[in-house]
């Protein structure tokens, strides 16, 4: 049977990046002890008050269709959170609730870009980005960011890539996979480019609450940017709610109207009991949230400490997020070959940097998703793998 060209645009290297993770999961299911550091799924449970809110909502009979745009109570809380964190004044009409930030990104791209449009994206990039932009026929124009520069975008390099076909920039800070955050001066320079060339800014801020060093800057808060910025966020990482699929877009009211139309034919709204749980998540600070954030910071510091003096390895200290990139080029192997060897011989699953783009070649990404002792053991095995390759084990 014949399939649409669309199926080819959403396949490719990004989809294949998860193969090593699925191999590791298969071995876990067979009873092997594998240390899984290959995916950004928090090892924490969702805080109990959030879970209870969903249960209470279900018991109250909230199992019917909900507002396609998202419950007003939830959208108001999201608007308040965004206003508090960014300084940008927004209201509930500038918020659309969707099934996670991944869905939010897909919806925004469908509403902003046409076939043949160009979007400038920092590379390395999250593995689904290319497929998401390709789905609408847009062309990704990568701006390489290198480990030697801390994986940070340089505004002058972005400027050199702008053409008459450029329609948008898409950036995330803290960055996935590197955890690098952009300073205010860089955001201001990028904002000037957006205004000068009439571009959209798609700002993925999923890791903004896991920023340990520096200041989080939301580009929508900068002068002239509110009407040309779509801000994406979710509860997945900050609240350990990856499986709940709660995300949103904050943007101009006109964009939100288009997103609502797309949500109508794509989702028909998020489940009300999940939205009620999300309301509880955003109602008041939960002590579990700061505890999780502090745990990620300690884990980051632990990995840097454990690998800092390991021959053949150079861990790169992230500003935030839940990953650490490690330069393994001195071992002589490609990142994919190193990751395969690490899984096959040492029982540790990580992602190869090549999965995120050529600028991350020679690096591996490991998730801060295990407790201190398993993470320390994973670092020991990573160091041993490198030492074997250098003939020092």
Swiss-Prot record:
Activity at various pH: Optimum pH is 9.0.
Induction: Induced by L-arginine in the absence of ArgR, via the AruR/AruS two-component regulatory system.
Pathway(s) it belongs to: Amino-acid degradation; L-arginine degradation
Temperature dependence: Optimum temperature is 42 degrees Celsius.
Catalysed reaction, written as an equation: L-arginine + pyruvate = 5-guanidino-2-oxopentanoate + L-alanine
UniProt EC number: 2.6.1.84
Obligatory cofactor(s): pyridoxal 5'-phosphate
Gene Ontology BP, a term: biosynthetic process
Positions of post-translational N6-(pyridoxal phosphate)lysine modification: 237
UniProt KW keywords: Aminotransferase, Arginine metabolism, Pyridoxal phosphate, Pyruvate, Transferase
GO molecular function (one): transaminase activity
UniProt cross-references to InterPro entries, sorted A to Z: Aminotransferase_I/II_large, AspAT/PAT-like, NHTrfase_class1_PyrdxlP-BS, PyrdxlP-dep_Trfase, PyrdxlP-dep_Trfase_major, PyrdxlP-dep_Trfase_small
CDD domains recorded: AAT_like
Cited function: Catalyzes the conversion of L-arginine into 2-ketoarginine via transamination. L-arginine is the best substrate, but it can also use L-lysine, L-methionine, L-leucine, ornithine and L-glutamine, which indicates that it may have a broader physiological function in amino acid catabolism.
Quaternary structure and partners: Homodimer.
Family: Belongs to the class-I pyridoxal-phosphate-dependent aminotransferase family.
Protein name: Arginine--pyruvate transaminase AruH
Protein source organism: Pseudomonas aeruginosa (strain ATCC 15692 / DSM 22644 / CIP 104116 / JCM 14847 / LMG 12228 / 1C / PRS 101 / PAO1)
Gene that this sequence comes from: aruH
